[in-house]
Amino acid sequence: MSGSNQILDGKMLIVNVRFLWYTFCMVLSDKDIKKALSSKRIVIKPSPALATQLGSCSVDLRLGNTFRVFDHSKHAYIDPSKKDYSNEITKVIKVEKDGSFIMQPGEFVLAVTLETVKIPSDLMGRLEGRSSLGRLGLVVHSTASIFDPGWDGKPVLELGNLGRMAIKLTVGMRICAMTFEELSSPAETPYTSKKFAKYKFQNAPEESRIHEEK
């Protein structure tokens, strides 16, 4: 096979892959998100104020009032294999409505959104940070950005302050954005149907349950 034919075949492969991606993995637009919310295909409670929370292809979620902080001064390290270790090295802090939480530079905190989100078996959710907050050094997830088909609960935020100045977070502020992507077909086993799903129906920033993995 000549070099030109190889290049042509490579380009055709790229085109086919892109076609399959756009055919089966579409991100919902603002119009489709409104339809999904209206038909209860996607359920967000309390209902978002679309005038301020709906983006071109995402819904902004607001910060809840519950935080889980790490008490690093009492423990030298974390042992993920130890049962209930998080209860020993973390503590829950609840902030009053419209209250604030100060994140110090380099701090890592678990939090939840004010909203509960329910995703159908033929969609997945993806949590993203907001650019305006990212420019201040705030990240909203360290690794877990994907919410499986069938998810039902409050999304947990893995907040980190990468900057050199403290950041004041206010309960109820728009903290992150969630997009929704179509699957090629409905999941055979949605998240809430999984026997060993560790975080289904959560409504608080629960500690890591990695020790439960088989």
Q: Predicted segments — roles?
A:
Residues 16-214:
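DUTPase catalytic domain/fold
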Residues 1-25:
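N-terminal amphipathic/basic-hydrophobic helices that include classical n-h-c signal peptides
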